[in-house]
């Protein structure tokens, strides 16, 4: 284990609450806490058993004045979060009380931790790898139970295990090639080009399989952005209200009521969905409405999915067709709304659209909402979302896999173009290095520092 100084930070949100927790980690954590602690019957902390708590008071070292009534816990390294000795002081919640205790800890010899420094120490001390460390921040920022489960699985090493298996397979090929080339006099079983080709191809298939869920992984982590578009008064705001089951958007019979973008959140099958209700798209001389229309188009370009609403009680006009052409290059669902009062849209006019994603609805009567939700799941998750699936939720991990994939493809091409198998080891090493960047084994120190700087204090 590496040697570090002793650090401290407030591990809970600073504000009014039942308790605040001040975390101290490092070789001197227990002696620092003990120097400002007074236990019942004057007991100190030096004989505290690991993984137990002791009741007492934090005192101001200079005056002996009691600052707060506390419970102190002790976790002995390496069986702790950072793999170092950790002390946690549970004091009363509140900004002033917490800060006073924190000041005494720093006066006693601890240094204020940098953002993410506790988790960084867990990584540097070998308790977790980098992908597991990144999962910690994903757990904190998770927006749904699926994203929490996925992040917890990653923190337990689910991704690391897969990556390490791939690296072991690559390393085995490298070792065999180099042993064959460098020690020809030894009686080693020679690995032929065909054997290497088959092994690399197998690894490539495994990488492709992991990458196949990368888009779903991004959605699990960040959620979906869904934009509702259409002409004014087609039912966009009614749809938003129905989906979130609240009356957040104003609904009137007056076209152009919604002039700005309205954003709300809902959940479909455990996935967070940001629903964006936009201003009706039409030609207008109203300056404010024009700005709203431009914002609508911006939101379409930023979205993962467009829900285009058409009024089925009226025939399509040029404005409808213009909107259809605008969204046709994106993932979309077409809602033929107001079917309760008419069905005048000729389906031949929208025959260039995928009929699987055309839904007849009457939002006023609550018809078609389940179809919309099922369609979203079909578009992005092939109909079902399973928390036990292996999701690549991190863009950095995805990039590492793509680079490793490219190196494997180059290795296969090298094998096809040359009879010398030692040349292929360069490409295989590159694949091994790129996969190692995911777990942090081969990543540059400045990038590691940048990753941990995104964490909150106390974590």
UniProtKB/Swiss-Prot annotation:
Which Enzyme Commission numbers does its entry carry?
Answer: 3.6.-.-
Q: InterPro entries attached here? A: G_TrmE, GTP-bd, GTP-bd_TrmE_N, GTPase_MnmE, MnmE_dom2, MnmE_helical, P-loop_NTPase, Small_GTP-bd
The answer on whether this UniProt entry bears the keyword Ubl conjugation reads no
GO biological process, any: tRNA wobble uridine modification
Kindly state what the record says about how the cofactor is bound. Answer: Binds 1 potassium ion per subunit.
Q: Which cofactor does it need?
A: K(+)
Ligand binding (K(+)): 233, 252, 254, 257
Q: Which residues bind GTP?
A: 233-238, 252-258, 277-280
* Binding residues annotated for Mg(2+), in chain numbering: 237, 258
Give the intrachain disulfide bonds. none
Q: Which GO molecular-function terms appear in the entry?
A: GTP binding; GTPase activity; metal ion binding
Q: Which CDD domains match?
A: trmE, TrmE_N
Q: What does this protein do?
A: Exhibits a very high intrinsic GTPase hydrolysis rate. Involved in the addition of a carboxymethylaminomethyl (cmnm) group at the wobble position (U34) of certain tRNAs, forming tRNA-cmnm(5)s(2)U34.
Under the subunit heading, UniProt states: Homodimer. Heterotetramer of two MnmE and two MnmG subunits.
Query: What is the protein name stated in its UniProt record?
Result: tRNA modification GTPase MnmE
Which organism is this entry from? Clostridium kluyveri (strain ATCC 8527 / DSM 555 / NBRC 12016 / NCIMB 10680 / K1)
Classification lineage = Bacteria, Bacillati, Bacillota, Clostridia, Eubacteriales
Corresponding gene? Answer: mnmE
């Amino acid at each position: 284990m590496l040697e570090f100084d002793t650090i401290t930070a407030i591990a809970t949100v600073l504000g009014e609450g039942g308790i605040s927790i001040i975390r101290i980690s490092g070789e001197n954590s227990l002696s620092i806490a003990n120097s400002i602690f007074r236990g019942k019957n004057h007991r100190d902390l030096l004989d505290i058993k690991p993984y137990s708590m002791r009741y007492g008071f934090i005192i101001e070292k200079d005056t002996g004045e009691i600052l707060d009534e506390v419970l102190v816990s002790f976790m002995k390294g390496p069986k702790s979060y950072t793999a170092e000795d950790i002390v946690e002081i549970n004091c009363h919640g509140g900004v002033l009380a917490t800060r006073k205790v924190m000041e005494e800890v720093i006066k006693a010899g601890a240094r204020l931790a940098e953002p993410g420094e506790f988790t960084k120490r867990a990584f540097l001390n070998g308790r977790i790898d980098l992908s597991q460390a990144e999962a910690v921040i994903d757990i904190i920022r998770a927006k749904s139970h699926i994203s929490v489960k996925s992040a917890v699985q990653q923190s337990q090493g689910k991704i690391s295990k897969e990556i390490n298996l791939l690296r072991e397979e690559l390393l085995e090929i490298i070792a065999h090639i180099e042993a064959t080339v460098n020690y020809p006099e030894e009686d080693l079983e020679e690995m032929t080009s065909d054997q290497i080709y088959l092994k690399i191809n197998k690894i490539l298939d495994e990488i492709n399989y992991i990458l196949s869920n990368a888009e779903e992984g991004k959605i699990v982590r960040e959620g979906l952005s869904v934009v509702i578009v259409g002409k004014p008064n087609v039912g966009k705001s009614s749809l938003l209200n129905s989906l979130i089951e609240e009356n957040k958007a104003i609904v009137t019979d007056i076209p152009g009521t919604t002039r700005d973008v309205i954003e709300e959140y809902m959940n479909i099958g455990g996935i967070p969905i940001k629903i964006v209700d936009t201003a009706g798209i039409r030609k207008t001389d109203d300056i404010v409405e024009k700005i709203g229309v431009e914002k609508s188009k911006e939101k379409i370009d930023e979205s993962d999915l467009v829900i285009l609403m058409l009024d089925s009680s009226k025939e399509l006009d040029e404005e409808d067709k213009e909107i259809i052409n605008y969204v046709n290059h994106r993932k979309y669902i077409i809602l033929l709304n107001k079917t309760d009062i008419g069905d005048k849209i000729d389906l031949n006019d929208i025959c260039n659209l995928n009929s699987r994603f055309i839904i007849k609805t009457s939002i006023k009567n609550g018809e078609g909402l389940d179809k919309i939700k099922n369609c979203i799941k079909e578009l992005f998750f092939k109909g079902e979302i399973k928390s036990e699936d292996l999701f690549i939720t991190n863009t950095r991990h995805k990039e590492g896999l793509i680079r490793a994939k490219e190196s494997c493809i180059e290795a296969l091409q090298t094998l096809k173009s040359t009879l010398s198998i030692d040349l292929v080891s360069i490409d295989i090493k590159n694949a091994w290095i790129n996969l190692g960047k995911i777990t942090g084994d081969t990543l540059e120190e400045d990038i590691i520092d940048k990753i941990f700087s995104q964490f909150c204090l106390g974590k």
